[in-house]
């Protein structure tokens, strides 16, 4: 745990929405009088028919039910577009930056309105109506946002499948929500390479025969694609014939807005269902307060819309707030390792939100590529996706933000809909590696294995004691699995699946997934702690730690280590790293095996696939499970070869 504290500076607090005192009073009223608090803040979005009921929720395992603003009627698309037209019609809604640095475009709110309405009318012409599901399988191009908002406009439920997923994964997700229509592209671009999309979509549809009736295809690369007459439609040709005006469907607050399939640790992917009203209130409010977003600023979240971060913090939250949001098709390392910072300068980005894995890989390339750019417009930096180790936090703060930008280290999940624990720039003193304090209305608790709520400084499992507006409502067509997965371990509480430590200041430190705990000779060790220690070593760029069967200790510690550019692995360095961790955490945390790895297996969103690393450490090479989400499968082959020898 880092013992450094960075107090709120006068610069951060002078025009922030909340300071420490206001946070305290708002938080207290949000948990003591939720109906009053959310009754007021629910009005931040426009309602066709205002709600009279605010909160109606139960975490009782026999009757899990979550309803917010349940008698209100609204539309997400009009909240993200139409309500801004009178005052912000000519303002840029979306800045799109292509994979190729020479390709970018600005889309105003007026243009966004026209594109979304045309696509909504096309969807209707192909028989899509309120309650139908539409699968979106697109690269990071503006059409992905248009498709989401067009579905929302007519009350269709979208299910986005990340463009890096295989035909098998796509087919399973189409079958999971029975989409009659899919929107895809001929191909995508990523890091200078073409990514097959229509080929995968064709293969997926074959696997789930009889479900998909229509495939709308965006021309992205102009590459040759197979064509099925009567089913396949070119996006541009269909839109050219459609009206640029489409009335918005009146949606109940509790109508589903989207389904997002997330991998279960076992079994089929889970279709997380998010609502309309509560979700949008939360996405817009967290976007404003957590990033301290101010009108006219340029906001960039580097995620993909295929992940929940892209849903909430590229599209819905920012656009509901009338923001200018940046969509990036490329990768941080193409054409050069300074790409992120070049984009920041090119588009004068004020708020930048990315993942620890990207920060660590950029840190591995040294300070030079960052310092070659200006970044003077940056005001707030954010981190999302996994706990950020203090070493990477410090680098991000010192080198990228030049010690003038607060870092909001945000903790949340696909299931939570939006940020639950995070600093607020004008209110929260920062501790590198800590997600700090809960957002309004969020009641975290730390419990022990028996479910006892722990007070004061402690370590245990993180649960949330009561509901918040953006909480997932159910798993698609499987409410029983929803109750089982999230409410049965600690009855009456939402179980996050994450381990957590709370310090003497009441700050929360996420220690990683509960299944990422190693039991060494009866001592429970969070893998995140050992990883942070390794990454703090000057020669280490990235580390992933897993447990493996050990004759004496029960479990041993297996550390995969990627070294900084230019550093060669050696037996001396291996010993040095073992003693480094031993000195930093204690003998109990000393790695038993240090495996120098040129790369780690990651999903396209940058998460390290520890499940695969565990299997390799255990030498269970034939039981790796689903590897379709890997960004670079060759990494796994290399690791297996090295482990086998």
UniProtKB/Swiss-Prot annotation:
SUPFAM superfamilies linked: Acetyl-CoA synthetase-like (SSF56801)
PROSITE patterns: AMP_BINDING
The protein's Enzyme Commission number: 6.2.1.1
Sites bearing N6-acetyllysine, chain numbering: 607
EC top class, as a word: ligase
Binding site for CoA: 190-193, 309, 521, 582
Reaction(s) catalysed (UniProt annotation): acetate + ATP + CoA = acetyl-CoA + AMP + diphosphate
Keywords, in A-Z order: Acetylation, ATP-binding, Ligase, Magnesium, Metal-binding, Nucleotide-binding
UniProt entry tagged with the keyword DNA damage: no
Keyword Ligase applies: yes
GO cellular component: cytosol
Binding site for ATP: 385-387, 409-414, 498, 513, 524
Gene Ontology molecular-function annotations: acetate-CoA ligase activity; AMP binding; ATP binding; metal ion binding
Cofactor(s) essential for the protein: Mg(2+)
One Pfam assignment: AMP-binding
UniProt-listed NCBIfam families: Ac_CoA_lig_AcsA, PRK00174.1
Entry's family note: Belongs to the ATP-dependent AMP-binding enzyme family.
Name by which UniProt lists this protein: Acetyl-coenzyme A synthetase
Organism this protein belongs to: Methylocella silvestris (strain DSM 15510 / CIP 108128 / LMG 27833 / NCIMB 13906 / BL2)
Lineage of source species: Bacteria, Pseudomonadati, Pseudomonadota, Alphaproteobacteria, Hyphomicrobiales
């Amino acid at each position: 745990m880092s013992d450094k504290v960075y107090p709120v500076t006068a610069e951060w607090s002078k025009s922030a929405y909340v300071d420490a005192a206001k946070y305290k009073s708002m938080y207290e009223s949000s948990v003591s009088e939720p109906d009053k608090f959310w009754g007021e803040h629910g009005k931040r979005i426009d309602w066709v028919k205002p709600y009279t009921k605010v909160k109606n929720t139960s975490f009782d395992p026999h009757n899990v039910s979550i309803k917010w603003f349940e008698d209100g009627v609204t539309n997400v698309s009009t909240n993200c577009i139409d309500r801004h037209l009178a005052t912000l019609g000519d303002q840029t809604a979306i800045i799109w930056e292509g994979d190729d640095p020479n390709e970018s475009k600005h889309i105003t709110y007026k243009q966004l309105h026209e594109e979304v309405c045309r696509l909504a009318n096309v969807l209707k012409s192909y028989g899509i109506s309120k309650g139908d599901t539409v699968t979106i399988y697109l690269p990071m191009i503006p059409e992905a946002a248009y498709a989401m908002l067009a579905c929302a406009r007519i009350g269709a439920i979208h299910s986005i499948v990340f463009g890096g997923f295989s035909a098998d994964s796509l087919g399973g997700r189409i079958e999971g929500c029975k989409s009659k229509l899919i929107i895809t592209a001929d191909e995508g671009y990523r890091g200078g390479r073409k990514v097959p999309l229509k080929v995968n979509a064709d293969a997926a549809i074959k696997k789930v025969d009889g479900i998909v009736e229509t495939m709308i295809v965006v021309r992205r690369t102009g590459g040759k694609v197979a064509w099925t007459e009567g089913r396949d439609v070119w996006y541009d040709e269909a839109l050219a014939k459609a009206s640029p005006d489409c009335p918005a469907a009146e949606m109940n607050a509790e109508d589903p807005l989207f389904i997002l399939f997330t991998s279960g640790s076992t079994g089929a992917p889970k279709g997380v269902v998010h609502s309309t009203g509560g979700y949008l209130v939360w996405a817009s409010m967290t976007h404003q307060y957590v990033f301290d977003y101010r009108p006219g600023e340029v906001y960039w979240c580097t995620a993909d819309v295929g992940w929940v971060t892209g849903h909430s913090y590229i599209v819905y939250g920012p656009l509901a707030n009338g923001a200018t949001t940046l969509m990036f098709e490329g990768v941080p390392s193409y054409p050069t390792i300074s790409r992120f910072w070049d984009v920041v300068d090119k588009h004068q980005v004020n708020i930048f939100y990315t993942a620890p894995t990207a920060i660590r890989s950029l840190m591995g390339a040294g300070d030079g590529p960052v310092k070659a750019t200006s970044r003077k417009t940056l005001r707030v930096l954010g981190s999302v996706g996994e706990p950020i180790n203090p070493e990477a936090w410090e680098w991000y703060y010192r080198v990228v933000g030049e010690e003038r930008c607060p870092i909001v280290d945000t903790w949340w999940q696909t299931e939570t809909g939006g940020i639950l624990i995070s600093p607020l720039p004008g209110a929260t003193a920062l501790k590198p590696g800590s997600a700090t304090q809960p957002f309004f209305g969020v009641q975290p608790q730390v419990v022990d294995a028996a479910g006892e709520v722990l007070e004061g400084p402690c370590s245990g499992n993180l649960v949330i004691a009561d509901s918040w507006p953006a909480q997932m409502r159910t798993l698609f067509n499987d409410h029983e699995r929803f109750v089982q997965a999230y409410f049965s371990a600690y009855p009456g509480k939402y179980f996050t699946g994450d381990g957590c430590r709370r310090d003497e200041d009441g700050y929360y430190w996420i220690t990683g997934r509960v299944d990422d705990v190693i039991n060494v000779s009866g001592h429970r060790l969070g893998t995140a702690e050992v990883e942070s220690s390794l990454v703090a070593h000057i020669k280490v760029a990235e580390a992933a730690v897993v447990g493996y069967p050990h004759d004496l200790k029960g479990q041993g510690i297996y550390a995969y280590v990627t070294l900084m550019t230019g550093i060669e692995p050696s037996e001396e360095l291996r010993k040095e790293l073992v003693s480094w961790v031993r000195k930093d955490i204690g003998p109990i945390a000393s790695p038993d095996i240090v495996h120098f790895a040129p790369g780690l297996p990651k999903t396209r969103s940058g998460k390290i696939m520890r499940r695969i690393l565990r299997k390799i450490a255990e030498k269970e090479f034939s039981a790796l499970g689903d590897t379709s989400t890997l960004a670079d499968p060759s990494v796994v082959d290399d690791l297996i070869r090295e482990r086998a020898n």
